[in-house]
């Protein structure tokens, strides 16, 4: 991502261009944008940590799920989400990747999408699927 995009994102209260795009999509569906409104406290081995999901999406049954946008999906992010899943198995965290086919690292055969499937995470490419927004 260019520094210009990042600068524009910060000016609008977000950290990336993808977050701006997802916020606009949520708003266009008539859903109030809740960006980084929640913190989930979890234990990183040997230390207490917290995670702030990007977006909180309400569901029609009164529940909600979180959407985490990812351009790069680094090893530390993957480890954090595995810890969160283990410590909060009923918390619904879903990913929207800027490129779900991106490999985890140079030379890897595993894409972001494959990693999500292996570990039981719901994911999408580029935008939030309409089905998610209509739950």
State what each model feature region is.
Residues 1-135:
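Nucleic-acid endo/exonuclease domains
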